[in-house]
Each structure stands twice: as structure tokens, then as C-alpha cells.
A protein has these predicted regions:
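Charged, amphipathic alpha-helical coiled-coil/dimerization segments
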Residues: 83-136
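Terminal interaction helix/tail motif
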Residues: 115, 119-166
Length: 219
């Protein structure tokens, strides 16, 4: 007897549920990759993630910002920062005029650890490489849309994506291969060059971000 997939009530099959199942499997593999890379550096994944977060932030970040970006509690972030400081991979200083606030910055030794960890790519990088070019591009844009939603509902801090950058001009050009413009470098670029974490990013004001997003997603 033929039983269709839709007749298996014990197995929820909404597309939303199945996508989350898929993301969960990918998250499992990413955690495994992170453990391998961190272990090779003599760190744990949270410590390595803190170094990666601070790598391109010359002015450092406060403990609260670090915790929010990593999705961990402030006490947990504080413990990891203390461990990294003992290893000489981070340094702490006062943040601006508020002498009680602590600013955390990566040291040259910390940068060296990041560079060594980067040399070993894991299975997730291989699985992305296995996608066709157009599939990579579609996935990148889908991720940007999901991340943007998570930002909007305050689930994560604003990321340094083109979609929130004051230099971003989506679909400013008629060239289908390079429709966007970055006013920071004054150059056209394509969908697959859209940034998730750009060092030159400067957050646009909310009205600019909303207008930019409208153009981007309708493009
Ligand atoms: S500065 Fe970076 S984030 Fe901003 S538009 Fe250019 S590439 Fe995108």
C-alpha cells in the first residue's frame, strides 16, 4: 500500500520544521569543527570565538558586547576573557572616560593563534565548496535575510553586513553581475560578494537601513 509522506502524523513535516532540522544538523557539524579548531589551539570554542570576534576590532569591545555577540552570559564571557588574558592573547583596558567599564582587545599573540586556527578548514567549509556557485550565492542571500530578521527582533546584535551599512547602495548598477555599489571603496560588486562581517562597515541610521533593505530584497 502506498503511504505518502504527508500521512505520517508523528513526523511533523512543515517546511519550517524541516528547515530547522536541517540547520540543527549543520550546527552540530559546526560545533564539531569549532571544537577541533579550538583544541588544536589549546582553547575551548568560546575562547576561540572571542578571539575571532576581536580580531578585526582594533578598539576592542566591552564584556557585554562580547557576551551579546557570542550569545553567552556575561559571567561566562568574563571567565573566558580572564583565561585568554592569562595566556597573553587578550589585554584589558579602561573604556573611554568610564573608568569602571572594561575594554577587551586582542594581542599580537592572539592574532597568531587565530591565523594558525584558520589554516585547518573543517567539514562545513568542504560542504560549502561542494555547492555550485549559484547555490552558494542563493544560500548567502538567504542567510543575510535570516540574520537581518534576527537583528530586527533583537535576538542578535546588529552585524557588520552590507544590508545595515551606510556605504551600501543595492542595485545601483544595471550590470547583473555587479549590481551593488560600495561607497567605501567606490566600487561595484555582485551578490556573492555581499558581506556578513565587514571591517569597514559603519551602521546606517534606521531609516536608511529600512530604505536600503526595501531596495535590496526587491532587487
Ligand atoms: S563597507 Fe563593507 S559592509 Fe559597507 S557596503 Fe562596503 S563592503 Fe558592504
Amino acid at each position: 500500500m502506498y503511504i505518502s509522506l504527508m500521512e505520517t502524523p508523528k513526523s511533523p513535516s512543515t517546511v519550517n520544521h524541516r528547515i530547522r532540522e536541517g540547520l540543527s544538523r549543520i550546527a552540530t557539524a559546526m560545533r564539531s569543527d569549532d571544537w577541533d579548531r579550538a583544541k588544536a589551539s589549546g582553547l575551548n570554542p568560546t575562547q576561540l570565538a572571542i578571539l575571532e570576534l576581536l580580531e578585526s576590532r582594533q578598539n576592542g569591545l566591552g564584556v557585554r558586547e562580547i557576551a551579546a555577540n557570542l550569545g553567552v552570559s556575561q559571567p561566562s564571557a568574563t571567565d573566558s576573557i580572564a583565561a585568554l588574558e592569562r595566556k597573553g592573547l587578550l589585554s584589558k583596558g579602561s573604556a573611554g572616560t568610564d573608568r569602571r567599564a572594561v575594554n577587551v582587545a586582542i594581542t599580537p599573540e592572539g592574532i597568531s593563534v587565530i591565523e594558525a586556527a584558520r589554516s585547518s578548514e573543517g567539514v562545513i567549509a568542504q560542504s560549502v565548496d561542494a555547492l555550485a556557485g549559484h547555490e552558494q550565492e542563493d544560500l548567502l542571500i538567504t542567510l543575510v535575510k535570516m540574520i537581518r530578521h534576527l537583528q530586527d527582533v533583537d535576538a542578535i546584535p546588529i552585524q557588520r553586513m552590507c544590508a545595515t551599512c551606510r556605504y551600501f547602495a543595492p542595485f545601483a548598477h544595471s550590470d547583473a553581475a555587479k549590481p551593488h555599489h560600495c561607497h567605501f571603496v567606490d566600487a561595484a560588486f555582485g551578490q556573492r560578494d555581499i558581506r556578513i562581517d565587514c571591517r569597514e562597515h559603519e551602521t546606517a541610521d534606521p531609516s536608511f537601513r529600512a530604505a536600503t533593505w526595501d531596495v535590496f530584497q526587491q532587487g
